[in-house]
Amino acid sequence: MLKMGVVLFIVLVLFPLATLQLDADKPVERYAENKQLLNPDERRGIILHALGQRVCCPFGGCHELCLCCDG
């Protein structure tokens, strides 16, 4: 009886969990492929924004990805 319980647990719990984990990886790969099409400046801005770091904007070009620095 114990062997049948172990087999049922593996088939009904562990096998579906393994297949769901593989399905969850696909959207992340698709998102990464889309981000590779960005130019290097956009990619740098996204990475710095995600890290919470901001750089000085070029002269007269202030926007949300950088700080307006004096100088």
From Swiss-Prot:
Residues 25-53 form a propeptide. It is found in: Secreted. It comes from the Eukaryota. Disulfide bonds join 56-68, 57-66, 62-69. The keyword Chaperone does not apply. GO terms for cellular component: extracellular region. The keyword Flavoprotein does not apply. Expressed by the venom duct. The modification Aspartic acid 1-amide is found at residue 70. Pfam families: Conotoxin. Keywords: Amidation, Disulfide bond, Neurotoxin, Secreted, Signal, Toxin. Residues 1-24 form the signal peptide. InterPro entries: Conotoxin (IPR004214). Belongs to the conotoxin M superfamily. The cysteine framework is III (CC-C-C-CC). Classified in the M-1 branch, since 1 residue stands between the fourth and the fifth cysteine residues. Intracranially injection into mice does not elicit symptoms. This is Conotoxin mr3f. It comes from Conus marmoreus (Marble cone). The lineage of its organism: Eukaryota, Metazoa, Spiralia, Lophotrochozoa, Mollusca.
